[in-house]
């Protein structure tokens, strides 16, 4: 049994970070590959939501999704939030798996406690369980940004999913940041305008 872990929203200027873990055996993973599973970035939103539903309802699949808000990212830092989320998944899902595979090149120092962790660069293209985790994390992120788009349409979150596209950066420059922006990220990019009041009034 393999536990695959991946994230969505790491490099976004707005919204939460989602880290997902999916545990299943290779036989079950093969079923998802036959359904068209691949790296979530190469799937249409419709296909991602379809696969998300199949993953969540499959009797032989264990899954965990951890959310870290923009506020938590600003308070603790992105690296700390990633580590805490992965740790939470391992604490919940470790008993289900004899192998743990994380997308990327860092185990966040957790390999001391969990020696069966393996980090795999582009793991979402190589390991089905990581691809399944990628699908879950991305579906959760997509859904969140669509919901936030209903509150703040000018930022184009339904299309850019919180990433720093030209339209998104121009909207921040013009309107200021919302309470859902990561201020630590937007300040770093020198695009944060202190016009918070204008957009915050809509939440009152």
UniProtKB/Swiss-Prot annotation:
Q: Which UniProt keywords apply?
A: Cytoplasm, Endonuclease, Hydrolase, Manganese, Metal-binding, Nuclease
What is the top EC class of this enzyme, as a single word? hydrolase
Q: Where does a divalent metal cation bind?
A: 6-7, 103
Q: Which InterPro entries match?
A: RNase_HII, RNase_HII/HIII, RNase_HII/HIII_dom, RNaseH-like_sf, RNaseH_sf
Please give the positions of the paired cysteines in each disulfide bond.
Answer: none
Q: Where does it live in the cell?
A: Cytoplasm
GO: which molecular function terms? manganese ion binding; RNA binding; RNA-DNA hybrid ribonuclease activity
Quick check: keyword RNA-binding in the entry? no
Which Gene Ontology cellular component terms are annotated?
Answer: cytoplasm; ribonuclease H2 complex
Q: Kindly report the protein's main subcellular placement as a broad class.
A: cytoplasm
Query: Pfam families in the record, alphabetically?
Result: RNase_HII (PF01351)
Q: Name the needed cofactors.
A: Mn(2+); Mg(2+)
Q: What does this protein do?
A: Endonuclease that specifically degrades the RNA of RNA-DNA hybrids.
Under which name does UniProt file this protein?
Answer: Ribonuclease HII
Organism expressing this protein natively: Helicobacter pylori (strain G27)
């Amino acid at each position: 049994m393999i536990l695959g872990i991946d994230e969505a929203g790491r490099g976004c200027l707005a919204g939460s970070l989602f880290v997902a873990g999916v545990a299943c055996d290779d036989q079950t993973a093969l079923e998802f590959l036959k359904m068209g599973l691949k790296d979530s970035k190469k799937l249409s939103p419709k296909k991602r939501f379809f696969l998300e539903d199949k993953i969540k309802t499959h009797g032989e699949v264990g899954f965990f999704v951890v959310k870290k808000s923009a506020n938590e990212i600003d308070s603790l830092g992105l690296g700390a939030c990633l580590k805490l989320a992965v740790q939470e998944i391992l604490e919940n899902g470790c008993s289900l798996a004899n192998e743990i595979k994380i997308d990327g090149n860092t185990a966040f120092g957790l390999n001391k406690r969990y020696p069966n962790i393996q980090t795999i660069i582009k793991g979402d293209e190589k390991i089905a369980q990581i691809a399944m985790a990628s699908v879950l994390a991305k579906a959760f992120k997509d859904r969140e940004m669509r919901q936030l788009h209903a509150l703040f349409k000018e930022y184009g979150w339904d299309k850019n999913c919180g990433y720093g596209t030209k339209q998104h950066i121009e909207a921040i420059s013009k309107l200021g940041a919302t309470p859902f922006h990561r201020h630590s990220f937007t300040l770093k990019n020198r695009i944060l305008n202190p016009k918070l009041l204008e957009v915050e009034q809509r939440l009152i």
